[in-house]
């Protein structure tokens, strides 16, 4: 099965290079891209990005930059220098911060997708209320996603439950990256707003993020292939 633009992103939630690369060597770059988050990047540094790219995988650098505009702009530029496929910032950092990130990429012929994080999938309405945010998670996602589009982001990270409304209000070209995806053979773990791969694609998600159902599987490649099969069912409309 050869997918030139894989919609599946596997989260590499490891703390050592050895354990990470052991898993990566079992995966297929025609079926997925790979996400490097804070734990792995802090433990291993930029070299882990290069090692994974050498193995043929596109990299989503998931560091969720959130700082003053100048600092975020420099961080995004550094990510572009690494040649990553996707990088993200927190929409709650504001329009000026996101615009600075966009401007930092102007000199690059091949730019990473610049994505904004809205509301983390682990957050419930009650969690937001505890932070002083009185609207629901879905309403907060709508607010932040609209701000992200205004600030020229390529898309947002959001729960699959919000995708239909976001696509309707922000347009089909605005990318939706959805964590909280659990294949039919896996449990819910610690994320509260979840969907299966088939459900998420039918809702309009552009890229799906999956972690433990693959990384902790007895046979990671088989798990990856099972998820790819679920995704194929969505494209067939069955």
From Swiss-Prot:
Highest taxon, organism lineage: Bacteria
CDD domains: OMP_decarboxylase_like (cd04725)
Catalytic activity line of the entry: orotidine 5'-phosphate + H(+) = UMP + CO2
Residues holding substrate: 13, 35, 62-71, 121, 182, 191, 211-212
Keyword Manganese: no
Gene3D superfamilies xrefs: Aldolase class I
Keyword Lyase set for record: yes
Primary enzyme class: lyase
Active site, UniProt feature: 64
Functional pathway: Pyrimidine metabolism; UMP biosynthesis via de novo pathway; UMP from orotate: step 2/2
A single BP term in Gene Ontology: 'de novo' UMP biosynthetic process
Gene Ontology molecular function terms on file: orotidine-5'-phosphate decarboxylase activity
EC code(s) of this entry: 4.1.1.23
Cited Pfam families: OMPdecase
One Gene Ontology CC term in the entry: cytosol
Keyword list, A-Z: Decarboxylase, Lyase, Pyrimidine biosynthesis
Subunit note: Homodimer.
Sequence similarity: Belongs to the OMP decarboxylase family. Type 1 subfamily.
Function according to Swiss-Prot or TrEMBL: Catalyzes the decarboxylation of orotidine 5'-monophosphate (OMP) to uridine 5'-monophosphate (UMP).
PANTHER family per UniProt: OROTIDINE 5'-PHOSPHATE DECARBOXYLASE (PTHR32119:SF2)
This protein's name: Orotidine 5'-phosphate decarboxylase
